[in-house]
């Protein structure tokens, strides 16, 4: 299922269009086939409040279980069939078009929110308090959308989204803390990979030995892999191997 605009998203998920570029959608009211694969043409923040394995993207033993957050860039898909997942029957979607944040501080800095480049299996798993904070911002945005659109709407809504993303950054950093032992294991596997490469002298160029190449061997996205390295050792891939 390809959803190109915020209005189309509202139509597919049974929500009213209060603004053509942004929407907060209650998934409990959505009428969508459980195993539908969806490609979104805009930024999408998906909050699942379902506490079951069918929605637990990458959930590990050391993670909280009160909510799961997945962030998608325009043109990205979320696959239900491939991962044997179901579209959440309880939760929320924040959908916003790039035009909404064009010319705003958020528009200039959204590339800094690297979790938009994580894969769904690297989702953020929220505590109850963290989920409540996310829901509070979604409610603020929803209330602003209930007002008539005026010259202040874009600035206020984009600021709320920016603050929400700042909290997501904080919560992801907390997740790196609670996953400390898991991450250390990944780091050891990475060093073992480097040892094999340099000691065995496999005929690979430095172009092949990239963050993308190593992340793929570790079953991680390059963005998550680099953020994990930054948290564990304070350096990204290229700094660590000193190219």
Name every feature range the model reports, one short phrase each.
Residues 1-63:
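Generic protein-terminus/edge-of-domain signal
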Residues 83-147:
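A hydrophobic/aromatic-rich effector-binding and dimerization subdomain
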Residues 54-56, 78-86:
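Short beta-strand His + acidic residue motifs that chelate non-heme Fe in jelly-roll/DSBH
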């Amino acid at each position: 299922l390809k959803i190109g605009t915020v209005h189309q998203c509202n139509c597919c998920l049974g929500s009213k269009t209060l603004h053509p570029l942004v929407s907060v959608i209650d998934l409990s009211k959505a009428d969508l086939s459980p195993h539908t694969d969806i490609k979104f043409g805009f930024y999408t923040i998906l909050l699942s409040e379902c506490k079951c394995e069918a929605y637990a993207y990458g959930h590990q033993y050391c993670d909280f279980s009160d909510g799961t957050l997945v962030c998608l860039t325009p043109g990205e898909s979320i696959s239900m069939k491939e991962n044997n997942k179901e579209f959440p029957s309880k939760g929320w979607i924040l959908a916003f078009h790039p035009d909404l944040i064009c010319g705003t501080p958020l528009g200039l800095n959204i590339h800094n929110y690297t979790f938009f480049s994580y894969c769904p299996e690297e989702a953020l798993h929220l505590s109850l308090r963290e989920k409540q904070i996310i829901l509070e911002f979604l409610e603020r945005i929803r209330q602003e959308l209930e007002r008539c659109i005026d010259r202040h709407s874009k600035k206020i809504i984009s600021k709320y989204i920016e603050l929400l993303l700042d909290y997501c950054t904080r919560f992801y950093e907390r997740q790196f803390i609670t996953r400390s032992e898991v991450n250390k294991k990944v780091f050891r596997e990475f060093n073992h990979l480097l040892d094999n490469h340099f000691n065995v002298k496999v005929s690979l160029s430095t172009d092949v030995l990239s963050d993308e190449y190593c992340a793929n061997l570790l079953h991680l996205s390059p963005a998550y892999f680099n953020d994990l390295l930054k948290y564990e050792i304070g350096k990204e891939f290229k700094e660590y191997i000193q190219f």
